[in-house]
Amino acid sequence: QALEANKFFVVFEPDIQNNLSRMAQRWGDDYNRNKLDGIRAMVFCNGWYANQVSNADPDMLALCPLHITLVEQGGSTRILFVKPSAVAQGSEAEALAGELEQAVADAIAAALQQLGDSPAAP
């Protein structure tokens, strides 16, 4: 919801752990050696940023769609996000990528704030 409130369109929300679990028998002892409880992702994009990135440097369209990965382990969740500013270093889209990165970081912070304000939050 926080991504959509910040004008990012969530395209897909795969349950990666569920998909990987289908391979547990085939992979045997090599399956989930880190004992992760869950892996989910959110694939999203903002049309305005996609247009601006394509205008600045079409090669940076690799940034769209963006994704966040949520890794659950031992009762906590880590949020993983590849920083667009790192990908766009030296590109004509570098400044825009930094702006995009900040917009996503703000959306993540808003989501965490909402969770912190929730009565169900620990």
Where is each model-derived feature located?
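Beta-strand/loop substructures that line and gate deep hydrophobic ligand-binding cavities in soluble
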Residues: 64-94
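Short, highly charged C-terminal tails/helix-capping segments
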Residues: 114-122
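Ser/Thr-rich, low-complexity intrinsically disordered terminal regions
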Residues: 1-59, 66, 94-111
